[in-house]
Amino acid sequence: MKKRNILTIIIFLFCVATSMAQNAENGKTGILLVHYGTSNDNSRMQTIDRLNARVAETFTDCAVVEAYSAPSVIKMLAKRGVRKLSVSQAIDSLKTLGCSKLVVQSTMLLDGVMTEILKKEVNRVKKDFRSVSAVRPLLYSVDDCRMMIEMINKSLLADKSVDATKMQVVLVGHGSDSPANAMYSQIDYLLKAEGKPSWHVGTIEGFSTIDNVEKQLAGVRNPNVLLVPLLYIAGNHQKDDIDGVWKQRLQAKGYHVEVFGKGLGEMKEIQEMIIGKIAAQVKDVDSGKANNATFHK
């Protein structure tokens, strides 16, 4: 009788363990959308909020949570009564929602300082999830650059308010002093090498500077210039730097200057590209193919 009771307990525990394993196997997938963030309400609505909504509408079986990676933006918004989660807080939120699988998608363009911070955070918590998938920044490889150029070109051609085919196009990025800044030069070289000699790349805070861009503009001898933000969120940088400093300086040199008023995050093509990346990651974590290697293609 005693042996039978022991056997019954063993069978019961085995069934419980099997059930728990199946629950973990079929556990919920959490999607973490990581944005640098912005204090510009209108820009946030047109980019971050719009992408968040599209992701939630597309992946209805997943829990979707956003995070801001810039502490300064989080603090600034908090003073206005707008609460945004940090990456660690957002991950905790997904845990609370019962997510055993994690997909991390950022809207960062370059593999810079903020991406390194995100990598460390994901590596720190990946042991807490059965499966984790995270992809590289939007501009990482030559193919990424080609795709971005193609999408920007499509967006410009679709906008009837400008005629980019008759203008010198200047993509204006943020820029930094990190090695990731070299990506801007790669894009500029790629444009010239693959048939767009009237397209140029400059940065607000890195290389190539506005001085370098002016030299390139002078070489083409077309007085019509279109400034295009190479920024996920145009926001204050477009208002103060692109539509301000850059436009005014080039106008003073005799150029006829127009500004394309959309950041990359407002472009439907860019949003769809990001959703495609998320779909591939969700498929990987749900099928068990994700190997917890962070920041793959």
Kindly label every feature range from the protein language model.
Residues 22-297:
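Active-site-proximal alpha-helix that buttresses catalytic centers in soluble enzyme cores
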Residues 1-7:
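Bacterial N-terminal signal peptides that target proteins for export
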Residues 8-17:
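Bacterial N-terminal signal peptides
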